[in-house]
Amino acid sequence: MPLHKSAEKRLRQAARRNERNRARKKELKGVLKNMQKLIDANAAKSEVEAAYKAAVQKLDRLGVKRYIHPNKASRKKAQLTKALNNYTPTAS
């Protein structure tokens, strides 16, 4: 337990920030999983493109605001772009 008032405040702030960071990263994981799920399910190209757009927007936002490292955001965007460009839905 903190002994000083300022240390107590820092503890509260850290807890709030930790919760916020976890929520943002969880949102990102959901968006990325959604795109991967659409690719695995052999969805229409337009659906995958919409998921790609949402994922790139989320990555850009989190990279700029430093929730994730900007280079990680850039790397993930490149991976998603490559997956989208190589994606061709097969008739099943």
UniProtKB/Swiss-Prot annotation:
Basic and acidic residues compositional bias, start-end: 1-21
An MF annotation (GO) of this entry: structural constituent of ribosome
GO cellular component, one term: small ribosomal subunit
Entries under InterPro entries matching the protein: Ribosomal_bS20, Ribosomal_bS20_sf
Chain intervals with Polar residues compositional bias: 82-92
Any Pfam family matching the protein: Ribosomal_S20p
Transmembrane segments: none
Record-level GO BP terms: translation
The entry's keywords: Ribonucleoprotein, Ribosomal protein, RNA-binding, rRNA-binding
Region Disordered, annotated ranges: 1-26, 73-92
UniProt-listed HAMAP family: Ribosomal_bS20
Family membership noted in the UniProt record: Belongs to the bacterial ribosomal protein bS20 family.
Function noted in UniProt: Binds directly to 16S ribosomal RNA.
Protein name, per record: Small ribosomal subunit protein bS20
